[in-house]
């Protein structure tokens, strides 16, 4: 890579036109790439009035901003000297372009973003309200950073510009508070409906339990009455059997007494007859002896 240096080394003019038409070239391998090489590469996009090479980077000054933007678009990420170039407009904030194999720091993720704190505040109070009423909180919504455009306020009308900004912030906060109150009222209605449904279910369950308890009491009473009736019938049967047995014993005892009386009478009659016969025999024997 060779070339003849024909441009100036001045690339640090502070006038707006020069700043807006200046190109920054980063990640430059200055050990291999020289100033003439840079001029040869970037000269095809427009006339170069200045070029300065430093350790690891360089600046190219064009006459027109249009030429500078064309160079940024055409040569960005081009590999020269074994390294991809990081090219952007010198007068604009440098966008973050991470190198291969490195992690992007978290500070650069949200450097140009502002969080919508009203959004997160309403979400926090809603989740706190749900937790206090025993409801399971929903999963948190994904964080969506909102990029707010920069508003330029003229210095001559500074007071009016500040007032308009304050008014806009008040209107935004008022809108968020009204939306938050509406959301809370909707949630209250939903909670009220759910509580009513739960109360209805509890009442129906209590009614069923009362019916089951009454049925159990009725069945227990009927079973108890049946047991008592069975016991009474058994006792009556036992009493009747006892009475029958006593009557039979009484009858058998009467028959035995009559038999004994009859036997005694017969024996007495037999004794009397025997004694009479003996007397008669004795008398007859005496009469025979006397004759």
Swiss-Prot record:
Residues 225-257 have a biased composition (Basic and acidic residues). InterPro entries: hnRNP_C, Nucleotide-bd_a/b_plait_sf, RBD_domain_sf, RRM_dom, RRM_HNRPC/RALY_subfam. Residues 21-92 form the RRM domain. Pfam families: RRM_1. Residues 258-275 have a biased composition (Acidic residues). Residues 182-219 form a coiled coil. Residues 152-185, 216-291 are annotated as: Disordered. Gene3D superfamilies: 3.30.70.330. GO terms for molecular function: RNA binding. Keywords: Coiled coil, RNA-binding. Residues 164-182 have a biased composition (Low complexity). SMART domains: RRM. Belongs to the RRM HNRPC family. RALY subfamily. This is RNA-binding Raly-like protein. It comes from Xenopus tropicalis (Western clawed frog).
């Amino acid at each position: 890579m060779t070339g003849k240096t024909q441009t100036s080394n001045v690339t640090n003019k502070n006038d707006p036109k020069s700043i807006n038409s200046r190109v920054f070239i980063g990640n430059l391998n200055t050990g291999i790439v020289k100033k003439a090489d840079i001029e040869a590469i970037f000269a095809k996009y427009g006339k170069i009035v200045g070029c300065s090479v430093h350790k690891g980077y360089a600046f190219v000054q064009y006459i027109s901003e249009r030429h500078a933007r064309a160079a940024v678009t055409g040569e960005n990420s081009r590999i020269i000297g074994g390294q991809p170039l990081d090219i952007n407009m010198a007068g604009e904030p440098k966008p973050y372009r991470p190198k291969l194999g490195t992690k992007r720091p978290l500070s650069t993720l949200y450097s140009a973003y502002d969080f919508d704190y009203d959004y997160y505040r309403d979400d926090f109070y809603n989740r706190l309200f749900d937790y206090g009423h025993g409801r399971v909180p929903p999963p948190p919504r994904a964080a969506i950073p909102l990029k707010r455009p920069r508003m330029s306020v003229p210095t001559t009308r500074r007071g009016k510009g500040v007032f308009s900004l304050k008014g806009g912030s008040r209107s935004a906060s008022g809108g968020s508070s009204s939306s938050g109150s509406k959301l809370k009222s909707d949630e209250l209605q939903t909670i009220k409906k759910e509580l009513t449904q739960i109360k209805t279910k509890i009442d129906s369950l209590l009614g069923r339990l009362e019916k089951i308890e009454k049925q159990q009491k009725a069945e227990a009473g009927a079973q108890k009455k049946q047991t008592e009736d069975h016991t009474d019938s058994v006792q009556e049967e036992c009493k009747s059997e006892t009475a029958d047995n006593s009557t039979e014993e009484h009858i058998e005892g009467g028959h035995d007494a009559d038999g004994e009386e009859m036997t005694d009478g017969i024996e007495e009659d037999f004794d009397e007859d025997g004694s009479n016969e003996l007397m008669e025999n004795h008398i007859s024997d005496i009469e025979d002896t006397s004759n």
